[in-house]
A protein has these predicted regions:
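Short, solvent-exposed loop/turn and secondary-structure capping segments
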Residues: 44-48, 75-78, 111-114
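Bacterial Sec-dependent N-terminal signal peptides
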Residues: 1-25
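Local sequence-structure signature of Cys/Sec-based thiol-disulfide redox active-site neighborhoods
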Residues: 22-69
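Non-catalytic, surface beta->alpha helical segment in thiol-disulfide oxidoreductase systems
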Residues: 92-119
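Residues that line or immediately flank small-molecule/substrate-binding pockets and catalytic motifs
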Residues: 8, 69, 104
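Thiol-based oxidoreductase modules, predominantly thioredoxin-like and allied folds used
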Residues: 59-85, 94
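Alpha-helical scaffolding within the catalytic cores
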Residues: 48-49, 83-87
Length: 119
């Protein structure tokens, strides 16, 4: 009987010590914004303005990556395309630019007007 009680007490102590206290206060987090763009894209400069505005609003917390690929980014000089960027555009079936993923949390890329409201 004593052994069973000691065993249960030991298991309970292990379970209680395994709990991690988590705060309920709002925490700052970093944001990763992938912007798909092209040098012949009409609206892409406005997308860059929006992305830079978000980065200025949260200095040191927003990381921007521009991926030049697709029909708006021909392989003429200066060629900003990469094989990885082209593969990402094809895999995500992106046809309108600028498009972006915020922290890669959505299944589909969203337009520049939705970047600041995305989780």
């Amino acid at each position: 009987m004593k052994r069973a009680f000691a065993f249960i007490l030991m298991i309970t102590a292990l379970q209680l010590s395994a709990q991690q206290i988590v705060t309920t206060e709002v925490q700052n987090r970093n944001v990763f914004l992938e912007e798909y763009t092209g040098k012949h894209c009409t609206w892409c400069p406005e997308g860059q303005v929006v992305a830079n505005g978000i980065a200025r609003s949260f200095p040191g917390r927003v990381f921007l990556v521009n991926i030049h690929a697709g029909s708006f980014s021909p392989a003429s000089f200066p060629n900003l395309n990469t094989d990885d960027g082209t593969a990402m555009v094809e895999a995500n079936q992106l046809y309108s630019f600028p498009a972006g993923y915020v922290n890669r949390t959505s299944e589909y890329a969203v337009g520049r007007e939705q970047w600041s409201s995305n989780p």
